[in-house]
A protein has these predicted regions:
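Carbohydrate-active catalytic/glycan-binding domains of CAZyme proteins
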Residues: 22-552, 611-615
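Short alpha-helical "patches" and their helix-cap loops
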Residues: 5, 532-541, 607-608, 646-651
Length: 665
């Protein structure tokens, strides 16, 4: 979670609030009746969500990682529990096993459609180079069966209609429709046709619904400004109308980070570009209703090196369209808002336990293999209490088999792995990687002369080394997914750490279609003999907590880049008054900041009401944004110094004056 920051305002050093204890992992639930997006601060891409009775279920893309297609369950849409993987492994040839120089990077299994019908859970999902696959189970916990469909249906979505017919839509821009056969594994003869022409402006990543007799299809547009075009019709035969603004441009102020275009070294990495709003915006998702009659939206957004994240949005129906967001700010989702009223409550928890001492006889659900693993070449039993990875031949980490990873966690986290290198043989390499392309790692190399610490960075092509006398070593990666940089350290006693190598730039690209994975690896660079093994005693993942709202404290506010604090009638310090649900009033001299009918903000005397209440939120990089409860818009300071409650949301470049930094007085 985000860290308790020392905020610097116009040259001042800010006073820090008390930092709460470190927590195990990001939780969207704030514990005060609100939640903060994303639902998980680790990659969960191409989400699809259903409700079955009082339970909600969620799955998403896993590409080449095994096991795949996680199934999560929730009662409140905010706190999710891992239930199962629908796919233990998908072994459809050498490329799925990293054999014969082949791989499935950027491919694999993706864009699942989750449905429940007549007592059976269905997940339809695409596989590159194969036909669409259908997974079925009578319980979300499994067991799941797999059957290939006879066609490949790009980014499909399935609707079990109330007349007994089963429709499937798929495609990019040009949307096609057909009926599925009774066994759901083929298209009905003569039923395929184009439903919506490319010129209508639909994207891909479809979600197909029938609501109150009307048909809806949500889609994902990823060119330039990302958004979610939605089509609707009274009948399947049309006419279909398309709305481009149901969810558009909501990036929570996040700009484009480092990007990589080349697939092989030397890698061309472009620097961050905050001047392009909407390039990280929410764009692929759908909607779901609650037992109480509310509607909520879910959608993924590109969040740079950490991967694509899933966000939750209140839905406001206007003129028959399910807009993400709130009245008077349609299409723009609040990052922090009141939790859904589902009629149920859940304790605060995360889906996974990230730290692992490998004491169990099975891998924890957080772990996934890079491609199909080689059974018999890894173990939790050969030496109880450790993960043993046998070194298999590979020229480098990209080609190494049995690399075990977990999705990296943002916005800032530290991963520490404990390695016993005594089992390595000359030519073996083992360690901790920030795996993507380009990747970086810190580890131990064994040569004929002994052990050496090494740190390699694929971005720069540089390797750094240090002598190692011990066989036991602690390997650490400090990750900042706001700046998208990382650094590596090591220790020989578990207490004192030394840096190795230069800071690593974590770039995002479509080479893997994934974010960074914190990964444990062991491979062998020689082929003259069988390799040894690496024993990992433990992995510890720690995160820095989000700052608390400074209730009861006097603060000053300033716009980044401006030299003076905000002033209202000469008042520059405001007491933060707790209004409940993460909302505040800002009080000074017996008055409160208040939003007038013209949306101009001024200091008004009297008690605080809706016009004086603001939802306290933060951008991903920790700047404060304040949403007026009266206008559902955000405060911004215009170039002349006036403050207005009329911003749809902060821009990534910060030039709109809609983000603030604060310090305690």
């Amino acid at each position: 979670m985000g860290r308790q920051r020392l905020v610097s305002l116009f040259g001042w050093a800010a006073l820090a609030l008390a930092t709460p204890a470190l927590v195990q992992t990001w939780k969207a639930d704030n514990g005060n009746g609100t939640y903060t997006n994303p639902l998980f601060f680790d990659e969960f891409s191409d989400p699809d969500m259903i409700r079955v009775g009082n339970d909600f279920y969620l799955t998403g893309t896993t590409m080449h990682s095994m096991p795949g297609l996680p199934v999560l369950r929730s009662r409140d849409l905010v706190n999710w529990t891992f239930v199962s993987y629908a796919l233990d492994r998908l072994d459809l040839g050498p490329s799925f096993r990293l054999e014969d120089g082949k791989n499935e990077y950027g491919r694999g299994i993706w864009a699942p459609c989750f449905r429940f019908h007549d007592g059976t859970y269905h997940i339809f999902s695409n596989v590159n180079g194969q036909t669409t696959q259908l997974f079925r189970a009578t319980s979300p916990a499994g067991p799941w069966t797999r059957a290939p469909i006879k066609r490949s249906l790009h980014d499909l979505s399935v609707l079990f209609d109330d007349d007994g017919k089963v429709h499937v839509v798929w495609g990019y821009q040009g949307i096609h429709i057909a009926q599925l056969t009774e066994d759901l594994t083929d298209l009905g003869p003569g039923t395929e046709r184009e439903l919506i022409a490319p010129a209508a402006g639909m994207g891909e990543g479809l979600h197909f619904y029938k609501i109150d007799g009307k048909y809806f299809i949500t889609s994902a547009w990823f060119i330039d400004e990302m958004r979610m075009p939605v089509a609707r019709a009274d009948r399947l035969g049309g006419p279909w109308e398309v709305n481009q603004d149901v969810s558009r441009g909501e990036d929570f102020g996040l700009g484009v980070g480092y990007r990589v275009g080349s697939r092989e070294a030397p890698f061309h990495v472009t620097p961050p570009d905050p001047s392009r709003p909407g390039r990280c915006a929410m764009h692929q998702g759908g909607i779901v209703d609650t037992p109480t009659g509310e509607w909520w939206g879910f959608s993924m957004m590109d969040a740079n090196a950490v991967g694509r994240l899933t966000a939750l949005s209140p839905v406001t129906w206007v003129d028959g369209w399910p807009y993400f967001g709130l009245p008077d700010n349609l299409g723009r989702s609040p990052r922090t808002w009141v939790k859904p009223n589902t009629g149920a409550t859940e304790p605060l928890h995360a889906p996974y336990q990230r730290s692992d001492d490998f004491a169990a006889h099975r891998l924890q659900p957080i772990w996934q293999w890079n491609h199909v693993p080689v059974d018999g070449k890894w173990s939790l039993r050969e030496r109880p209490g450790v993960l043993r990875l046998h070194a298999l031949p590979a020229p480098d980490l990209w080609h190494a088999r049995n690399t075990l990873g977990q999705r990296a966690i943002g916005p800032r986290s530290t991963v520490t792995a404990t390695l016993d290198a005594s089992g390595l043989k000359p030519g073996d390499v083992a360690g901790l990687a920030l795996f993507n392309r380009p990747y970086a790692w810190i580890g131990v190399e064994r040569s004929d002369d002994g052990l050496t610490l090494a740190q390699l960075d694929e971005v720069t092509g540089k390797a750094s080394r240090a002598p190692l006398q011990n066989t036991r070593v602690w390997l650490r990666a400090d990750c900042d997914f706001v700046k998208n940089t990382a650094s590596f350290h090591y220790s020989t006693d578990g207490a004192t750490y030394a840096a190795l190598g230069e800071p690593h730039v974590m770039a995002y690209g479509l080479i893997t279609f994934q974010g960074v994975r914190s990964s444990l690896f062991s491979y062998r660079t020689r082929s003259d003999a069988e390799g040894g093994y690496a024993d990992f005693d433990a992995i510890e993942v720690t995160e820095v907590p989000r700052p608390a709202v400074p209730y009861g404290r006097r603060i000053e506010l300033a716009v980044p880049g401006r030299t003076s604090p905000l002033a209202f009638d000469e008042a520059v310090a405001f007491t933060v008054v707790d209004r409940g649900l993460g909302r505040v009033a800002l009080e000074a001299d017996g008055g409160h900041l208040s939003v007038g009918q013209d949306r101009v903000v001024s200091l008004r005397r009297g008690t605080a009401g809706e016009a004086e209440t603001f939802q306290w939120m933060e951008t991903f990089d920790g700047d404060l944004v304040l949403m007026s409860l009266a206008t559902k818009r955000y405060l911004r300071c215009d170039p002349g110094g006036r403050v207005l409650a009329d911003s749809p949301g902060p821009r990534p470049d910060g030039q709109d004056g809609a983000r603030f930094r604060w310090r305690v007085r």
